[in-house]
Amino acid sequence: MASNNVAQFAAELKMPAGVLLEQLQAAGVQKASEDDALSETDKARLLDHLRKSHGATDGDKRKITLTRRHTSEIKQADATGKARTIQVEVRKKRTFVKRDDVSETGADQAQAQTDEQAEAELKRREEEARREAELLEKQAQELRERQERLEREEAERRAREEAAEAERRRAEEEAAAKRAAAAQAEAAQQAAAAREQAQRAQSEPAEQSAQDEARAAAERAAQREAAKKAEDAAREAADKARAEQEEIRKRREAAEAEARAIREMMNTPRRAQVKAVEPPKPAEPPAAKAAEAKGTLHKPAKPAGEAAAARPAAKKPASGAPAPAAAPAGDRTKKPGTGKSGWQDDAAKRRGIKTRGDSSGGVDRGWRGGPKGRGKHQDSASSFQAPTEPIVREVHVPETISVADLAHKMSIKASEVIKVMMKMGQMVTINQVLDQETAMIVVEELGHRALAAKLDDPEALLVEGEIGSDAEQLPRPPVVTVMGHVDHGKTSLLDYIRRAKVAAGEAGGITQHIGAYHVETPRGVVTFLDTPGHEAFTAMRARGAKATDIVILVVAADDGVMPQTKEAISHAKAGGVPIVVAINKIDKPEANPDRVKQELVAEGVVPEEYGGDSPFVPVSAKTGAGIDDLLENVLLQAEVLELKAPVESPAKGIVIEAKLDKGKGPVATVLVQSGTLSRGDVVLAGTAYGRVRAMLDENGKPTKEAGPSIPVEIQGLSEVPGAGEEVIVLPDERKAREIALFRQGKFRDVKLAKQQAAKLESMLEQMGEGEVQNLPLIIKADVQGSQEALVQSLLKLSTDEVRVQIVHSAVGGISESDVNLATASKAVIIGFNTRADAQARKLAEANGIDIRYYNIIYDAVDEVKAAMSGMLAPEKREVVTGMVEVRQVFKVPKVGTVAGCMVTDGVVKRSSSVRVLRNNVVIFTGELDSLKRFKDDVKEVKQGFECGMSLKNFNDIVEGDQFEVFEVTEVARTL
């Protein structure tokens, strides 16, 4: 979401709007309220201000990289015990950056971290800034309390020191005065006693008063000096405390501002170099302090005051002890040339003291960050922290997705997805493709949100292109489809209009392809589509109705409304296309146009004279009667429709028919619906794409361009497109290839996913059905529409016992690969208007493959139907040949029971089966064991003769039983 005002920008940065207004005013951007507009320039000025306040500089820093290489040899024994000398080369690389002079301002004195540290700490800086702000808040509170205590203690200490100093000076003055008095006394002793006594008596009071006056003056001066020093110390301590509080406040504000700046920079695409704020450091050992105070070649030393101000803030406040006074930096200096400071790792200089806890919240942890992590490198950028709560992800699930990709989207292992699917009762592998519904169930099962979406679908660009086209709409010719039942004269009617003879050259006198022609009439151009009338070409007729503007429904006057006539009416009504009825064959004596009208009214097509909206025109394709009236009505309907299409725009159309020509390659008949198709255009048709190399009209003549409603044949596609596919002209062949490959993969993945989902169901169906005969077929046709119609017609022949299995169907001639496939699958090859080449014929003869050629769809369907009938199991029927009555029963040793019988009806044969009836109830069914007349075995006994009969495995024969004699015959079945 683009932030247009201060309030929106503050919500985006997750900070109060008032704080943002203060920062904007500090940056020189005058914004008074939250509703003020905010431009990109204002944001840039705010970012520059924040960077400068954090110490970022624009100047390039000079740096030098030094590499040291050291080679040594070591000897090591291998597995055989033999000593080997190994060359070991150690390379060390250090980068030194020249910093600014130490005497510059505080922003220039701050140490800029190296690029590697900045990149590593950029990701965790926001969390660290928050922790540092909380820590600084605590430290500020405790610092204020400690500072007050320090001020009081410092004032008392200095007062005591001043008082002691004044007392010492006063004692020295008294001692000096005493020594002077003693010297004078010694000099006076040499004089006369009288005079000395007199002088002593006179000078003693004066001397005492002088000493008292000098002592009082010295005390007053000492008190004034002590008070002045105490006042200076208190003022200095207060200034220092205020400076430290101001520094803490600035650092807290800087940390918060830096966190906001980091959030903004993480959202921007370009990489912004932000100078990192130096985090507070714990107290350091003397060696590290000396190195820091002096500085190295690439790290300047800090001033003593700054180091002393930074140390109390980083020390743990719970200790309660006052901070030690900062010693002068010059007392603990270390020369750069001594030791290993030039090649030593920076982390050695940042080694902290041992503490019971980390007061910095993990901000300052380096190579040896804590007491238990000594010697271990824990890089915070690469260390993993387990989430405290489960992460719910939004998973975009395409139409098909593999198990591995689905697991990757959820950031889990593929084995977890496989486990869940096993619990759901489906065994999958890591590379198996799942359909969208199954994948979404798995995502929900694992606790994530599943969204059905098409990510990176290149076809979305096509929709955007359609919306953006605003070319001028111009009138276009109408597209008229001729539909009707087979043999009702559709092609003959078009032949008369076009003055051509297409019908005479068609196999069997029927149309088996969809044809496209355009005819110039005195009133304009009309494009005709001729569709087949056979029931097998339903899909072809549906495509014709989809691409048309007007339908001419041809009905034979002597035949009336037939099944395909009704189907054509339903296609036209489904497409919302007006119908013009042509009642053909009115020249025949048995023609009855009135009956045709009544039948069409029953189907919902009402003529104009009956109050409907469908013109009925009686015509004769043989004599030409009524043809002009038919064209007049068609053009009248076209004027009412006001057909328009853009001309000066990329072409769009539909594939009417497609085929594979041996010399030309894939050829597609395209009806242009809008725009202009030119030679050299890049076209996309379904999964096929390519550049138009050649373009022919319906007469086979080359043409350079085709406008709306004009049918043309184009060459140059990558493969044979599907009939009915939409044709689009694209400006870029790379984009066309991308969309075509995407469609191919999508079609293949969806097909595989559906096959996988239906495996279990089909397995159960086959188990329930038992043994089913399969007739494998390979179908090669001349055009896509014929191949589609033939496949659908043959699949309809399948029954519960015999099933047609289409192993492969395609457009083009029969090749060696087709014969090899037929050999492997034991299939029969059917060529519809195609032939096999020489190599394929030789291979088929060698392998015994049956190749059948047809040019009429009836013949192909009938022969396949006959072959399937031969595969059916024969039907067994029982035929009763005679009836026998038992007159007497004989018990014969070693033979069994023999019945003396009379043949009452028909004939009894030795090979017949017998059914025993007792009281008209069947009690046994079996075979004859013997058939005798007197003592001779006979083959048959006719009606009216007596015979003796014995049955296999049945001796319970009673007088009065009847034997029904029958034979089982097998009858061939048909579909």
Swiss-Prot record:
Domain tr-type G: from-to ranges: 475-644
Region (G5) location: 620-622
Detail which positions bind GTP.
Answer: 484-491, 530-534, 584-587
Give me the ranges of the annotated region G3.
530-533
UniProt feature, compositional bias: Gly residues? 359-372
Record region (G4): 584-587
Q: Which Pfam families match?
A: EF-G_D2, GTP_EFTU, GTP_EFTU_D2, IF-2, IF2_assoc, IF2_N
By its UniProt entry, which InterPro entries does this protein fall under? DNA-bd_dom_put_sf, EF-G-like_DII, EFTu-like_2, IF2_assoc_dom_bac, IF2_II, IF2_N, P-loop_NTPase, Small_GTP-bd
| Stretches the record annotates as G2 | 509-513
Keyword Cytoplasm in record: yes
Q: Where is the composition biased (Low complexity)?
A: 104-115, 178-211, 302-330
Where are the annotated segments for G1? 484-491
User: GO CC terms on record?
Assistant: cytosol
| Family membership noted in the UniProt record | Belongs to the TRAFAC class translation factor GTPase superfamily. Classic translation factor GTPase family. IF-2 subfamily.
Name this polypeptide is given: Translation initiation factor IF-2
**Gene that codes for this?**
infB
